[in-house]
Amino acid sequence: MAIPITVLDCDLLLYGRGHRTLDRFKLDDVTDEYLMSMYGFPRQFIYYLVELLGASLSRPTQRSRAISPETQILAALGFYTSGSFQTRMGDAIGISQASMSRCVANVTEALVERASQFIHFPADEAAIQSLKDEFYGLAGMPGVIGAVDCIHVAIKAPNAEDLSYVNRKGLHSLNCLVVCDIRGALMTVETSWPGSLQDCAVLQQSSLSSQFETGMPKDSWLLGDSSFFLHTWLLTPLHIPETPAEYRYNRAHSATHSVIEKTLRTLCCRFRCLDGSKGALQYSPEKSSHIILACCVLHNISLEHGMDVWSSPVTGPIEQPPEGEDEQMESLDLEADRIRQELILTHFS
């Protein structure tokens, strides 16, 4: 069980009680529009987070100068959604950038501790069948239980000698593996892979691969793009379709797989700390991976609370390292190829 951490308000220690603090900032004193513009979430959602994370962010104390869970959560949300520790964000709640940084660290760890509660594949057969039905209704692709893709998130260089995080654009990044359902809910998130790894290598070494290699529901597949190799449990598009049925398969595959592309764009637009618009995450790879995962947890909680996650403006494709020619090669897995051809003949001929 994680030990709750009490964060002290350094501004109070420096300036005394006359300095405005978040304990004097009341959510009920500001409008919903203000909360959305500054922190990206509505009032009731913030109250829910206070209830969910409060025990991890505070403990009984005689100190009067501890920053409240509410303060810490607002500071973290402000960073996640804006991507910076800008002065106006701290001023809005009466804390310094240093205090904001500590708040972000604590809220991030509290969310990461709860990741498995909000990010997981459904366990029962009825839920699995529901996934298949929903994906099939999108473009007629049978047996799909999730769409998978990778996304690079820029981080600061760990050190001059470590090149494992340098991606094909020559920038340092984490390559994150994500699986979503048709609603955009995240069912698998792995955020710690170094940016030098190609998508197919990330998948090969992932917990997701181990999970599906050891067993999966019958006639169930993930959909991946051409950066992945074909597997018995992962359907990829045909590199060179020849027959009408193969073209129909590729069109259905593309239309269905687009849900993960849309989800990743939306995730980065909602959480600007991920999109690089304010620069790379200025943390170690481990801390950066936790921040990414925390944003993913918030994304899923938003969906559970009925928030319209698609309403964030999406400006276009996320800039990512270029794919190499080797990523367009077909797998030599003969059994996987047989399964795909059988599916094409059965459902697209």
Curated annotation (Swiss-Prot):
InterPro entries: HARBI1-like (IPR045249), HARBI1_animal (IPR026103), HARBI1_dom (IPR027806). The keyword Signal does not apply. Keywords: Cytoplasm, Hydrolase, Metal-binding, Nuclease, Nucleus. Its cofactor is a divalent metal cation. Transposase-derived protein that may have nuclease activity (Potential). Does not have transposase activity. It is an enzyme of class 3 (hydrolase). It is found in: Nucleus; Cytoplasm. PANTHER family: NUCLEASE HARBI1-RELATED, PTHR22930. The lineage of its organism: Eukaryota, Metazoa, Chordata, Craniata, Vertebrata. Interacts with NAIF1. It comes from the Eukaryota. Pfam families: DDE_Tnp_4 (PF13359). One of its GO terms (cellular component) is cytoplasm. It comes from Rattus norvegicus (Rat). This is Putative nuclease HARBI1. One of its GO terms (molecular function) is metal ion binding. Its EC number is 3.1.-.-. Residues 148-300 form the DDE Tnp4 domain. Belongs to the HARBI1 family. Its main location: nucleus. A divalent metal cation binds at residues 149, 199, 225, 261.
